[in-house]
């Protein structure tokens, strides 16, 4: 009897082990079936999930045919939808344009106008998604001229609505387009708003606004308007080493373009007058501390910031038309003064 009980317990442990193995194997099999079923399960083409839209791109590549998804989404914009639905439709159009570029290329100019019409909606989220969709379409060359026609509307939105997400979307669109000369009058009117965005607390909006003004600073007929634009007394805080490297780099490029522009022969041939709180006085005036900020950025941890700071210093010391004659270069009277 004493020997029988231990043997029985051993057999019981063995049975438990077999049961455990069987249970584990069964669970694994059920998990395998669930995963396999999930992989085989294809949501309908009308699904708005990112996975579904990505699958559309793959299917189109595989079978060489249009999914029809962009057309379906554009057609649904014609229907009366609530603001949230319109916003989501535009969001999905944006994703589809990036994923299905060949299919997006078959869209028409009327489709671009349809998307641009959404800029007149009252809800800011609809405006933002419409701007994002236009930005996506602007990557297709044939639509760029058509989208340019709506630049004035975009500038109006940026200057009249204080919504940083809208600013980012609108400025990204403008920075992706060559701006025609006929929008320059509108650009002059929105420059104070652009300066306010540059001095805001939203890094993304600041970077985009500086990038746009840096591009415009290279336009001869806009340079004075930019330099005479009013800025806050603490504008030079944008050149502090504590600022994000991406913003510092763009601000330094902007300063270089302004310095080169004001040193150009045709610009110096005119006697310009600037207001006391202008960007010109903040950067190049007799009381400017830009030189000190630039010197501190020469040892910035990021190499591209260091290089760009050096470029600004060179542009300040050597006027553009004297750059080919080093012996004639002389320090600017506004920065790096003799004896300092």
UniProtKB/Swiss-Prot annotation:
ARM repeats mapped onto the chain: 100-139, 179-218, 278-318
Chain intervals for the UniProt region annotation (Disordered): 321-340
Major site of localization recorded for this protein: nucleus
UniProt name for this protein: Armadillo repeat-containing protein 12
Compositionally skewed regions (Low complexity) per UniProt: 324-340
Gene: Armc12
Gene Ontology cellular-component terms listed: mitochondrial outer membrane; nucleus
Tissue: Testis-specific.
BP terms from Gene Ontology: flagellated sperm motility; positive regulation of cell growth; sperm mitochondrial sheath assembly
Cellular localization per UniProt: Nucleus; Mitochondrion outer membrane
Chain's role: Essential for male fertility and sperm mitochondrial sheath formation. Required for proper mitochondrial elongation and coiling along the flagellum during the formation of the mitochondrial sheath. Facilitates the growth and aggressiveness of neuroblastoma cells. Increases the EZH2 activity and H3K27me3 levels in a RBBP4-dependent manner, and facilitates the enrichment of polycomb repressive complex 2 and H3K27me3 on gene promoters, resulting in transcriptional repression of tumor suppressors affecting the proliferation, invasion, and metastasis of tumor cells.
Disruption phenotype annotation: Knockout male mice are infertile due to asthenozoospermia and abnormal sperm morphology. Mutant animals show no significant abnormalities in the gross appearance of the testis or epididymis compared with controls, but have multiple sperm mid-piece defects such as absent mitochondrial sheath, and scattered or forked axoneme.
Keywords, sorted A to Z: Differentiation, Membrane, Mitochondrion, Mitochondrion outer membrane, Nucleus, Repeat, Spermatogenesis
Region ranges (Interaction with TBC1D15): 1-101
Tree of life domain: Eukaryota
Signal peptide: none
Membrane-protein topology: Peripheral membrane protein
Pfam families xrefs: Arm_2
Oligomer status and interactors: Interacts with TBC1D15, TBC1D21, GK2 and IMMT. Interacts with VDAC2 and VDAC3 in a TBC1D21-dependent manner. Interacts (via ARM domains) with RBBP4.
